[in-house]
């Protein structure tokens, strides 16, 4: 955290942590893209993606990408079920099993263009301050 003052409030600290997490995600996506790994879509599963619309919207705004969130309380178990049904021959592919068994997506978060320029200024400052060291 930078700029911390005695008057800094808990919501301001929470926002700073959420923003730093979103910036780190963007840094990872940028690094992958620069090295030839194209990420076609972002999908939120469990935890924060289901509990915090605020964080998910911030992530969409920072990355400039739409994020789909699935509505599944036991995503890991459902993933096992999907693969097991394909291996057992119930479905011909993972995609077919997903279409049949999963509720996808429950919500979508679309980037808000009006927020992007300000967030990109803050992202550049984050990188300049040494966010997500690259080694």
Identify what each model region corresponds to.
Residues 1-135:
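Glycine/Thr-rich phosphate-binding loops that ligate phosphate moieties of nucleotide
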């Amino acid at each position: 955290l930078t700029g911390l003052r005695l008057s800094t409030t808990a919501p301001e600290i929470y926002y700073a942590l959420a923003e730093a997490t979103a910036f780190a995600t963007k840094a990872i996506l940028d690094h992958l893209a620069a090295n030839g790994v194209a990420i076609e879509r972002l999908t939120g599963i469990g935890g924060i993606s289901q509990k915090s619309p605020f964080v998910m919207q911030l992530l969409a705004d920072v990355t400039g990408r739409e994020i789909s969130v699935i509505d599944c309380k036991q995503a890991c178990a459902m993933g096992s079920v999907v693969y097991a049904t394909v291996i057992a021959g119930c479905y011909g592919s993972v995609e077919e099993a997903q279409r049949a068994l999963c509720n996808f997506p429950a919500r979508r978060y679309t980037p808000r263009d009006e927020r992007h320029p300000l967030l990109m200024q803050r992202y550049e400052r984050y990188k300049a301050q040494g966010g997500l060291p690259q080694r």
